[in-house]
């Protein structure tokens, strides 16, 4: 019997990086998710943050409004979890609390984030990995480059 795929919450900032460039680990992670290498968990709040960030003027040079919509529609096939109740988890940056609460509510195996406030959490449940560390974990577990 095949193992269930890893369940992961990816920080919207990593997803923004994937939109900005098809080169690099963030895009590779989105591609791995599209190829069903892991289960991606999203919430209305996460998707709203992603939409808000991508609508900022500084990101207009990376894609039109239509391209942003196409990118956002990709996440319609992710596992949608209702926004969990607020929890105080990340003392250094309360704006990140919802990501950890979402991951806990969804019983995610990992959170992938480049945010230092998250990656430096000791004994985080679930563990927080940098995008590169999560990519390397996937590559090792699934035996692919």
Give the predicted meaning of each segment.
Residues 106-112, 116-145:
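Acidic, PIN/NYN-like endoribonuclease modules and their adjacent C-terminal/linker elements
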Residues 77-111, 116:
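Active-site neighborhoods of divalent-metal-dependent phosphate/nucleic-acid chemistry enzymes
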Residues 19-20, 54, 122, 138:
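Short, flexible helix/strand-to-coil boundary loops that buttress conserved ligand/catalytic motifs
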Residues 24, 41, 63-66, 90-97:
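Residues at secondary-structure transition points
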